[in-house]
Amino acid sequence: MPQRIPLWMVGVMAGLGVIAILGLFFYGSYAGLGAG
């Protein structure tokens, strides 16, 4: 049987993805306000 990806690893990757997206969003808005 093909080895499946552990559920906890999927959760960690999803969490990191969300944190990265939120970080880029807040950083972009902060940089935009600072440049304005």
Swiss-Prot record:
GO terms for biological process: photosynthesis. It is a single-pass membrane protein. InterPro entries: PSII_PsbJ, PSII_PsbJ_sf. GO terms for cellular component: photosystem II; photosystem II reaction center; plasma membrane. The keyword Hydrolase does not apply. It is found in: Cell inner membrane. Keywords: Cell inner membrane, Cell membrane, Membrane, Photosynthesis, Photosystem II, Reaction center, Transmembrane, Transmembrane helix. The chain crosses the membrane at residues 5-25. The keyword Transmembrane applies. One of the components of the core complex of photosystem II (PSII). PSII is a light-driven water:plastoquinone oxidoreductase that uses light energy to abstract electrons from H(2)O, generating O(2) and a proton gradient subsequently used for ATP formation. It consists of a core antenna complex that captures photons, and an electron transfer chain that converts photonic excitation into a charge separation. NCBIfam families: PRK02565.1. PSII is composed of 1 copy each of membrane proteins PsbA, PsbB, PsbC, PsbD, PsbE, PsbF, PsbH, PsbI, PsbJ, PsbK, PsbL, PsbM, PsbT, PsbX, Psb30/Ycf12, peripheral proteins PsbO, CyanoQ (PsbQ), PsbU, PsbV and a large number of cofactors. It forms dimeric complexes. Belongs to the PsbJ family. HAMAP family: PSII_PsbJ. PANTHER family: PHOTOSYSTEM II REACTION CENTER PROTEIN J. This is Photosystem II reaction center protein J. It comes from Gloeobacter violaceus (strain ATCC 29082 / PCC 7421).
